[in-house]
Amino acid sequence: MTSSVAFAPIFHLRKQAEAFAGTRIEDVVMGRPVHFVDDDAEVDARAEAKLGETAREAGFTNVKFQFEPIAAALSFEHTLDRDELVFIADIGGGTADFSVVEVGPKRRLMADRTGDILANDGIRVGGTNLDMRLSMAAVMPHLGSKSKTKTNRDLPRWPFVDLATWHRIHTLATSRNMTTFKQILADCADPVPFERYVEVIRRQGGHAIAGRIEQAKIDLSSTDTIIVDLTEAVPGFRVRATKRLFERAIAVELERLSGAIAATLQASGRKASDITTLFLTGGTSAVPAVKQVLSTLLPNARATEGDLFNSVGFGLALEAKRRFAPTKAVRRAT
């Protein structure tokens, strides 16, 4: 049995799909980011191979992959009555993927769409990166990240980065770390903020903070100032966050997104003025600062949002239909 964390959800989805269809399902088209890992083709290939192996262990025998932004393009194409040159921006929780694709009602009938895909690119920037930056800017100073030692040195940075990074939170509450935290606390010129940090760890409140920060990021899309209630992590703990603070905090990520967008456009061989539509999908594409980066680089494109969380899935279903339906006789559930 595989040790991959992806096995259980893939197996569950296959069983659910078979129950719905009333037949065994052996074929699958799985979405993948353009790059699992930035700038490392070998590791990227291993990641896809591992995911394919896990899918086969979960019961699929014929496993194919499609880039997630291409799946989003297929979803958008399904709604069109004319040809368009589309820039697809699929920015989710962990990755930002971009494609330039020619789409249209006649093109969707073609068996081979390779020539319609003018460029693909992607980077590992997504919602979790923005969450981490917001947490570091709005929450961690209240837990000691800006505090000094009795000799006026900065506190170590890693405890705060790990607490702000959702997949690192569970690593903090070890006896070794708690000993280290006590030593840091004893050396603090003002111990109060770091005492609060230690309390968060003792109460296992890190994931509560992460959840509240994710919601704060969403709320700051529609309001300028919010109070983030962190009392689930520490009683009475609340912090103020502003849109301006958030946008300053994510400046590095915005710059990386800008570079990847420009690189994708350059690779396509087309000018920004040639793009007729900017199609947005993935929850992070709804962040106003992210939208602003896209609209600045593609000023003439008509921006349209798909289903932010389901466009890729629908496009993968269309791709599976194109690849498998002509050769498979599917028995409908009764």
Q: Where are each of the predicted segments found?
A:
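A short acidic Gly-Thr/Ser loop motif
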Residues: I88-D97, G126-T128, I213, G282-T284
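Core structural elements
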Residues: M30, A96, A173-Q183, T281-A286
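N-terminal phosphate-binding loop and flanking beta/alpha elements of the actin-like ATPase fold
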Residues: M1-F87, G104-I123, R238-S268, T277-F279, ...
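Intrinsically disordered or highly flexible coil/loop and linker segments, enriched in small
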Residues: A19-T23, G144-K148, Q215-I226, A263, ...
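Short flexible coil/turn linkers enriched for glycine and charged/polar residues
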Residues: T23-R24, L80, I91-T95, H207, ...
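A polyampholytic, Gly/Pro-enriched intrinsically disordered region
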Residues: R82-I91, S145, K321-T334
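Phosphate-binding glycine-rich/basic clefts of nucleotide- and phosphate-handling proteins
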Residues: E102-E232
